[in-house]
Regions:
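Active-site neighborhoods and metal-handling regions in enzymes and metal-associated proteins
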Residues: 1-412
């Protein structure tokens, strides 16, 4: 991937006499000497290709030049004996295409010298805050520290600039998402072959997660949802402890992660291999909405417009079943959006200044119906690549037609 080109695009949006400082992050402490698996800051990864802790990217733009410096930890033989090898200077250069790589202990001095020369007026940080987060991330904490240390300099947010770039995937990124989806497909076939009454939800989850790792994924894109029966009506249920009963459905919302890029797929399977008449009626409504979104999505549209299209199809179907009397009552059974962007994050970033779809965007297509009184939760989710004239369903090969699902599960 062309990380140098991405940095060039960021430089174009930065003001002169400014600097961008991005931190990869640090380990998250759990308890005693236990740390959570490290996840690098996604924007740091996007601009460098590196996903290790304790790294810093410095991009400086003055009146005369643009300069990029990468700071990494120096190798410590004792630490490496316990925790594995660090990225070397040569490896960091090769991955990131950054020639100027220095060790981390020189970072503060480099910044102090840069600020003392009086050719920097403002500092950019990644101050993105997801709508559900109530705690600042590491980059936000560091931004506050720098604002206090250098009070005469403006602190600015670069997150929307990078978000706008991330919304349009290049060919390399699309290829990685395709691979993540392909691995997800193989794992779902394995799940369907083994799903049967009496299984625990966590066993279906285990079948999926075993197969994605076996086929080369680095792990799941997000915690696997495996909700059977009434649990399928809970949008983000991930306890996955109940038994899959005969005659019930199993809703699985899941995805593989491959080289940093995510798949996000939902399929709803009959536990015993055959949908009941009522389940089939609801399934057909959701599938019709899924197909209508895929048929309609194109450049210039917004996710809100796609959601309204899905709601109309779902509402019409629910009125035919007698579940609702008016179209605006559909919120009783469908209470989320039909789409979000997909990429490095499963709920990938969006730029507030530009919410219309452009070629290269990858979005989800995930209508659903959640009917508590029938203990039926059905969601069908695919991943769409927006093209010049419409869209391509990247997950088309993952079977969703109910006849095909029943035939596949019967032949096992």
């Amino acid at each position: 991937m062309n990380f140098a080109e991405r940095r060039k695009q960021v430089f174009e949006k930065m003001e002169k006499q400014s600097a961008l400082i991005l931190f990869s992050g640090i380990e998250s402490h759990v308890s005693a000497d236990e740390y959570a698996p490290f996840e690098a800051d996604r924007n740091f990864f996007y601009l460098t290709g590196l996903r290790r802790d304790h790294m810093i990217l410095l991009m400086k733009k003055t009146l005369k030049e643009e300069q990029v410096i990468l700071f990494i930890e120096e190798a410590d033989p004792t630490q490496e004996r316990w925790y594995g090898r660090k990225v070397t200077v040569d490896e960091a250069k090769e991955i990131s295409s950054i020639e100027n790589v220095m060790f981390l202990d020189s970072f503060e001095g480099a910044v102090d010298r840069m600020m003392a020369r009086e050719d920097i007026d403002s500092l950019y940080f990644d101050c993105y805050r997801y709508q559900f987060e109530d705690m600042p991330d590491y980059n936000m904490i560091k931004a506050k520290e720098f604002a206090e240390k250098y009070p005469g300099h403006a602190v600015k947010n670069i997150s929307q600039v990078i978000a706008e770039l991330r919304m349009q995937k290049d060919g390399d990124e699309v290829a990685l998402v395709r691979e993540a989806i392909g691995i997800t497909d193989k794992a779902l076939q394995y799940v369907m072959k083994h799903l049967e009454p009496g299984m625990a939800e966590y066993q279906a989850q285990a079948d999926f997660e075993y197969m994605i790792r076996y086929n080369g994924a680095e792990g799941t894109a997000f915690p696997t949802i495996a909700g059977s029966g009434a649990n399928g009506t809970m949008l983000h249920y991930d306890t996955n402890l109940d038994i899959c009963e005969d005659g019930s459905l199993l809703l699985m919302d899941l995805g593989a992660k491959y080289r940093g890029y995510c798949a996000d797929i939902t399929r709803t399977y009959p536990v015993n291999g055959t949908y009941t008449e009522r389940q089939r009626q609801v399934y057909d409504i959701v599938l019709a909405a899924n197909r209508e979104v895929a048929k309609t999505a194109k450049p210039g549209m917004t996710l809100k417009e796609l959601n309204e299209i899905a709601k109309k199809v779902l509402a019409a179907g629910c009125m035919k079943l007698g579940l609702i009397e008016k179209e605006d009552e559909i919120d009783t059974y469908y209470m989320h959006g039909v789409s979000h962007h997909l990429g490095i994050d499963v709920h990938d970033v969006t730029a507030a200044c530009n919410d219309t779809l452009q070629p290269g965007a990858i979005i989800t297509d995930e209508p659903g119906l959640y009917i508590d009184e029938w203990e039926i939760g059905i969601r069908i989710e695919d991943d769409l690549l927006i093209t010049e004239n419409g869209c391509e369903c990247l997950s088309e090969a993952i079977i969703r037609d109910p006849d095909e699902i029943e035939a596949f599960m019967k032949d096992r």
